[in-house]
Amino acid sequence: MSEYVVDTSVVIKWVVGEPETALALALRQHRLSAPDLLVAECANILWKKVRRNELTGDQAVFAARLLDRADIELVPARGLMEAATSLAVALDHPAYDCLYLSLSERSGRPLVTADTRLLKKLGTTPAGIYSGRVIDLRAM
């Protein structure tokens, strides 16, 4: 069993049919962790899907219940904030995503993401410093 950090772009696919849902579900056989920010981000995505008429309120609440029971080690964001802020400034990228990067660096576990904006940003870093540490879900 491998160990990974996963972000919201991966976890939300467990409960909402999206491209790469099967790949995201396959990750559940591994040991997974994420900053506790994941909970708020998933809830917000579910709310947005209700607002866009992509889910009913009942479906969103049911999806939230399933995610709340998911086997993911939630790590307090508080201990990641300084490193995440430093990464956000260095990368000129939102600190929310950098919390996941920070946890990946601290734990030594690769980050798996489907966030194309983050992947594009990291692809422009000097000498591919994130190569192998950040994995595109589509490459799993």
Regions found by a protein language model. Give the residues of each.
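Hydrophobic side chains within alpha-helical segments
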Residues: V10, V16, V39, N44-W47, ...
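Active-site-proximal, substrate-binding regions of enzyme catalytic domains
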Residues: L37, A43-A83
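Short, well-structured N-terminal submotif of metal-dependent ribonuclease cores
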Residues: M1-L37, R52-V61
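Acidic, PIN/NYN-like endoribonuclease modules and their adjacent C-terminal/linker elements
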Residues: E3, P35, L101, E105-M140
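Active-site neighborhoods of divalent-metal-dependent phosphate/nucleic-acid chemistry enzymes
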Residues: I72-K120
